[in-house]
Amino acid sequence: MSVQLSMSYSDNIDEKYMREAIKQAKKAYALDEVPIGCVIVHEGKIIGRGYNRRNTDKSTLAHAEITAIKKASKKIGDWRLEECTLYVTLEPCQMCAGAIVQARIPKVVMASMNPKAGCAGSIINILDIKEFNHQVEVVNGVLQEECSTMLKEFFKELRIKKKMSKTL
């Protein structure tokens, strides 16, 4: 399986659920967290939602994908999310990519690649390691511009806040 750009195939559905992931990312943004959001869909229904809360929860585990996977597993009563699709606003890190493989999620739809920490094609593709017993289809580029703009705005504001705090 490889990373592919989403152009026309199931665009409407992918955009619909990516917009839900963006809503989650905006919750993180409101908490001064890196704005990453995630939803997990099963049979046309969202069964798990999450957004980045690392600073708020003081936990390296409080990533959007991990939270959404926990909620989805609880909702369906199984750790295996074999008939689900995960939508996330930024390419998963190594921890989240590993959790996606472990949860047996067959498909991940991403908005933006993460050249500094991405493990679904940017640095490494954990989701497609043939030696694992499960590989994941990856679709990239759904609402990419909107998500990239939100991330850029967040980091621009963060730099301004840091600069202002140094001058006080």
PLM features: residue spans?
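Zinc-dependent deaminase
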Residues: 2-31, 79, 95-168
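Active-site phosphate/pyrophosphate-handling residues
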Residues: 16, 45, 67
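A cross-family signal for key residues in well-ordered alpha-helices
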Residues: 19, 38, 70
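Short, basic and Ser/Thr-rich N-terminal targeting/leader segments
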Residues: 32-36, 82
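Short beta-strand scaffold segments in enzyme catalytic cores
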Residues: 36-44
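A short acidic/small-residue loop/turn micro-motif
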Residues: 53-56
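Helix-adjacent hinge/juxtasegments
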Residues: 61-62, 66, 70-103
